[in-house]
């Protein structure tokens, strides 16, 4: 029996509707370029009364597990800045790896196709299975792919460290703010 699409959309809409004000999910991420990997938001939705971040199932394109961030009702501006920075970093990371994986798979298919064609072989064997190359031949592709993308990965790693240091810095500020709020003397309400 074929799956019913409208039911899936209804479940997702209901899940988001019943999640309440106290539990909002990170915004949907979108492809920024035409050749970028397509965007896909998981149907996963944390329980309505959850007061924690939840890690969802792996993304179809990036293979990373997205985090569904909990937004408390009394979130301070500093906590909001930290959460938004984490969301932005997650979206950036998801998009990078979705694009990288798409490029990898396209180039790998082209490499295999060209090598099989050079050997005079078809893409399918006589038994109908997909023809493959041996480990040594694939090692050439992996080495070439890594060499070609070295600069891109170097910039990614540099930006990844910058973002993580910024997140760690804001986490420290949030922790200090919470400690200060606990230690600060409470204002007594005066009745007139």
UniProtKB/Swiss-Prot annotation:
In the UniProt record, the transit peptide is located at 1-10
Q: GO cellular component terms?
A: matrix side of mitochondrial inner membrane; mitochondrion
What post-translational modification does the entry describe? N-terminal mitochondrial targeting sequence is cleaved from the mature protein once in the mitochondrion.
- Membrane topology type, per the record? Peripheral membrane protein
- Print the keywords alphabetically: Apoptosis, Membrane, Mitochondrion, Mitochondrion inner membrane, Transit peptide, Ubl conjugation
Give induction info. Answer: In conditions of increased oxidative stress, the protein is stabilized, increasing its mature intramitochondrial form and thereby protecting COX from oxidatively induced degradation.
- Name where it's found: Mitochondrion inner membrane
One GO BP on record is: protein stabilization
Pfam families the record matches: COA8
Cross-referenced InterPro entries, in alphabetical order? COA8
What is the recorded function of this protein according to its Swiss-Prot or TrEMBL entry?
Answer: Required for cytochrome c complex (COX) IV assembly and function Protects COX assembly from oxidation-induced degradation, COX being the terminal component of the mitochondrial respiratory chain.
Q: Which family does it belong to?
A: Belongs to the COA8 family.
Protein name, entry field: Cytochrome c oxidase assembly factor 8
Source organism (scientific name): Bos taurus (Bovine)
Protein's gene:
COA8
